[in-house]
């Protein structure tokens, strides 16, 4: 008789323990149900990068003096600078400048050490192509200014990059 009562007691304790664990799981689920979705509908919602975001490099051909500092400070010697020495001016004349963004690690050393500030980082991060050879940008492609996400009326901008704290969940879509 006492053995039966002990079995019922242990069974009821285990059932209560299991119900407690199931309740804790439901509480986590209900906690996440109150939050807004963080999923980004990519073509229609885009991230607005921060000020220090390192995107595609913009190049200004007229400012470049062909000093090749960018090549020397690049960890992978990536920029290709072709120049010709002009004897009458006793100066280097830049002919072509190219960067292969399929290899670039976007470290920003070339931008930081450029003495004439002809290189700058843009907020363009959409560099996907079907052929990797299309990522080799010459001085004409590097000189093209990117379209700003803020200026596109068809796109909603997302304020933060990635992590949103629990208290700042509402209103993370930029209503412009």
From Swiss-Prot:
GO BP, sorted A to Z: photosynthesis, light reaction
A molecular function (GO) term: quinone binding
4Fe-4S ferredoxin-type domain residues: 55-84, 95-124
GO CC annotations, alphabetized: chloroplast thylakoid membrane
Entry keywords, A to Z: 4Fe-4S, Chloroplast, Iron, Iron-sulfur, Membrane, Metal-binding, NAD, NADP, Plastid, Plastoquinone, Quinone, Repeat, Thylakoid, Translocase
Record's bilayer topology term: Peripheral membrane protein
Family recorded in the similarity comment: Belongs to the complex I 23 kDa subunit family.
Function: NDH shuttles electrons from NAD(P)H:plastoquinone, via FMN and iron-sulfur (Fe-S) centers, to quinones in the photosynthetic chain and possibly in a chloroplast respiratory chain. The immediate electron acceptor for the enzyme in this species is believed to be plastoquinone. Couples the redox reaction to proton translocation, and thus conserves the redox energy in a proton gradient.
Assembly behavior: NDH is composed of at least 16 different subunits, 5 of which are encoded in the nucleus.
Protein name, per record: NAD(P)H-quinone oxidoreductase subunit I, chloroplastic
Organism name: Mesostigma viride
Gene: ndhI
